[in-house]
Amino acid sequence: MVRPLNDFHEAKVRIKLSSYSASLLNLSCNNVLQSIKESNTSVKGPVFLPTRRRVYCVLRSPHVNKDSREHFEIRSHFRIIDISSCSSETIEMLMRLDLPTGVNIEIKT
């Protein structure tokens, strides 16, 4: 059930940011923290979560040379920001926040 914005005066909000690029993620965390601090709310974070590393092994040759392989990896970086007492203005600021395209954001109450 979705609560109206008026019920967020004492809500706890968790923001989870994820990206393949650590530099974009740090830039986005700084933007989120700056907008939260403008509304004078207490915040914890950013909390660095473990980096998920996925390695893919691919044969270099399409037909022979099974011993010749190539490894590719994808690293996923995660951060969490907790807001303890959040107002409706803060929620609206977070919804209007402009983040880079490589960053995924989840806002949970």
From Swiss-Prot:
Biological process per Gene Ontology, one example term: translation
SUPFAM superfamilies per UniProt: Ribosomal protein S10
Subcellular location: Plastid, Chloroplast
UniProt xrefs under Gene3D superfamilies: Ribosomal protein S10 domain
Chief location of this protein within or outside the cell: plastid
InterPro entries, alphabetized: Ribosomal_uS10 (IPR001848), Ribosomal_uS10_dom (IPR027486), Ribosomal_uS10_dom_sf (IPR036838)
Family statement: Belongs to the universal ribosomal protein uS10 family.
PANTHER family registered for this protein in UniProt: 30S RIBOSOMAL PROTEIN S10 FAMILY MEMBER (PTHR11700)
Role, per record: Involved in the binding of tRNA to the ribosomes.
Protein name per UniProt: Small ribosomal subunit protein uS10c
Taxonomic source organism: Cyanidium caldarium (Red alga)
Name of the coding gene: rps10
